[in-house]
Amino acid sequence: MCTGDRKMPKSILLTGSTGFVGTNLVKSLTLKSDYIVKSAVRHAVNKDDGLLFEVGDINASTDFELPLKNTTVVVHCAARAHVMDDKEAEPLTLYREVNTAGTVNLAKQAIDSGVKRFIFISSIKVNGEGTLVGCPFKTEDNHAPEDDYGLSKSEAEKQLVALAKDSSMEVVIIRPTIVYGPGVKANFASLMRLVSKGIPLPFGSITQNKRSLVSINNLVDLIVTCIDHPKAANQVFLVSDGHDVSTAEMVRELAIALDKPTWQLPVPIWCYKLFGKLFGKSDIVDRLTGTLQVDISHTKETLGWKPPQTLQEGFKQTAQAFLQANNR
């Protein structure tokens, strides 16, 4: 029987497939006939699933030989997640164990296995914690991490770049900013809960800052683009929705998405600063009132890519999932 020039599906190994980004990436990739998606997981619930490989904790000694067999592309999403005010005795050691040593170990084994491309989901924290309005982070900026999580990601990036120079494996680095979407947790979910109550909120004066956000759909679309795009090789990409918002504007857009009234009281920013100092919450206050913008022009121009989903569309989708989950 003649099969013509039909291409063989590309084998992709994904780490972090049970996390927020990984779960959504698996959903997207499995809809495409071009890919065979394998997952390296800490614990495999279904050990008969031939596409799930139990590897235990990811660190410098994790054995990836079996899942890497016949793999063309690795997408490395797994990480020790950032924790505000980490209470561990030596958080940097723990971040490095997973985010740096674990990443480099996987990359080295990928090279030995003949993997063509390694996509690393890093963090905008490699660039730093904040910017001035109108002075966004750019791809070419020097690394300037300010916390242990960002440092561990920065160190991993530098070692990956060095490995790529000495091998035939291409490395692609993606630095997301704050990611939101259906099922999002942490601070974004907390903000949605507040807005969903329809009560007056004290964010009316926070109008001069700007935050770059990225919907999970836009991030996943960029990752999928980087799997095949020839110009993605050995590049660093920043990613956002392309529309930056102040805290007050973010709350207003969320209220619209949740179909709730929005009353924002103009509490002076100095009150926030004082609260942060008195109660040891300065990091949270800085995030609430500060600016963090990213310039995605390099991403768009290099790949011919643009975010397929607007911020308003992303907020609406996120809000609908939130309301369904909470039976509202």
Curated annotation (Swiss-Prot):
GO molecular function: UDP-glucose 4-epimerase activity
Keyword Isomerase attributed: yes
InterPro entries hit by this protein: Epimerase_deHydtase, NAD(P)-bd_dom_sf
Named cofactor requirement(s): NAD(+)
Pathway: Bacterial outer membrane biogenesis; LPS O-antigen biosynthesis
Pfam short name (any one): Epimerase
Enzyme Commission no: 5.1.3.2
One GO term (biological process): galactose metabolic process
Reactions catalysed, as given in the entry: UDP-alpha-D-glucose = UDP-alpha-D-galactose
Binding positions for substrate per the UniProt entry: 123, 149, 198-199, 215-217
Active site positions: 149
Residues noted as binding NAD(+) in the record, renumbered to the chain: 20-21, 41-46, 57-58, 77-81, 123, 149, 153
Signal peptide per UniProt: none
Keyword line: Carbohydrate metabolism, Galactose metabolism, Isomerase, NAD
Family note: Belongs to the NAD(P)-dependent epimerase/dehydratase family.
Role noted for this protein: Involved in the metabolism of galactose. Catalyzes the conversion of UDP-galactose (UDP-Gal) to UDP-glucose (UDP-Glc) through a mechanism involving the transient reduction of NAD.
Known partners and oligomeric status: Homodimer.
PANTHER family: DTDP-D-GLUCOSE 4,6-DEHYDRATASE-RELATED (PTHR43000)
Protein name (database record): UDP-glucose 4-epimerase
Lineage, uppermost ranks: Bacteria, Pseudomonadati, Pseudomonadota, Gammaproteobacteria, Vibrionales
